[in-house]
Amino acid sequence: MNQWVSWIIGCCFGAILVGCTMQSNMALSHSQRPYDFESHTLHPRGVAIPGSTDSVDVFFDVNREECLYLRESPQSPFVSQLECTVGAHRFTWVDTLVSGASRWNRKYVRLDWHEVFPEWAGQLVEEIPLSITDLQRNVRHAWTTDVLTKEASLPAYHSDGWPLNTRHAVVGDTLYFYSPTGSTWHHASAAVPTTLPSPPFSHVKDRSDTLEPLIRSTIVSGNSRWNSYIVLPGVNIIADANSAEPRIVQRVYGTQFPFDQVRDLRVMIQSCRYITSRKEFERMVASKDSKAALDAFWLNCANEKDRATQMISTYYGRVEEANRYFSGVLEGWRTDRGMVHIVFGVPTKIRKTGGSEWWIYGEEGSANAVTFRFLRTQHPWDDQFFRLSRNILYRTTWDRMVTNWRNGRIQPD
């Protein structure tokens, strides 16, 4: 997360090291702070795809940098020990650290549905509870993943046969899907507007729900049954070409960079628009040395280098969190939730009721508490699209927070 900190200011940050101290009690994922990336020790990913009528394929990805590797003696290799659960099924996953190992450690298992749910009786399964425990750190992360039913969707795969574990892919990547021989599909796409959400006190409607993807190619599945397409910017869909009614079986969002990372100078400048004046922003965009202009902005806010480094770490750390948790048809930092998360930080409390999220800052019920309500809204290209309930009363609170940023009075989450 901190690579861009040293890149902007020229300050060096050490890598985040995994601790070696065993905790006495099991550390669980922090459901009270679901959008605080740093409050979770492990960030595994899992994809579940039916393998047949009575089995399911589960694909795990675990970041090796987040696991604790130990060895029994100076001559022994370093190994990690993970315990995984898929529903009721439990197994141990041991990984030996070798030179040149990739960042992500992968594990694939095919399980009978009765192993996952002992009471299974042939019914359709829509989601599966998963968990991974680092036995050497005594840390556990549990989550639920949807089952990508082949009747309703065609999972997207990378060239190595591993499924896409998000709905985002870098523009220019080639994705694959498996379909019956002779079936015909349309690949369509639409670029997404790059506008920012209006402040909490201003009402300007988002237009991403008016996108109309255009057909870019027609794909006829051959004897291998494997088909491919190149990811284009914005919304990419695969639709049944022979269906009387539009039947979309795959949706992928094409981004110029890995969607959760903030490494590009243009993105760094664009995402700080929430706390800049219009003139400051236009000056950075038009500057012949945009990096120097961005440096100058942060140093001017903080008044001294070390403070600027901390503010950069906090701000762009929140941008990355917004991308991880809120990205859909829009990049996470461009969404209503992303905007509030970046400027205000991690809420003191989050309440989720039905199709709403209530973000509470400060002591709930007190006169100084600030509450934002986000409503889940129907969107043709995003099933997790939330809109902020805006109100002119937020003007004072918003201006105060922006002023705090500009005066260097922001504390890390």
Where are these regions (language model features)?
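Bacterial N-terminal signal peptides
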Residues: 8-19
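Positively charged n-region of N-terminal signal peptides that target proteins for export
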Residues: 1-6
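Short, surface-exposed beta-strand/beta-hairpin micro-motifs centered on an aromatic residue
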Residues: 224-229
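A cross-family detector of function-defining hotspots
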Residues: 286, 294, 298-333, 337-383, ...
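Short beta-strand elements
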Residues: 137-163, 244-274
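Conserved structural position at the C-terminal beta-strand
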Residues: 132, 240-241
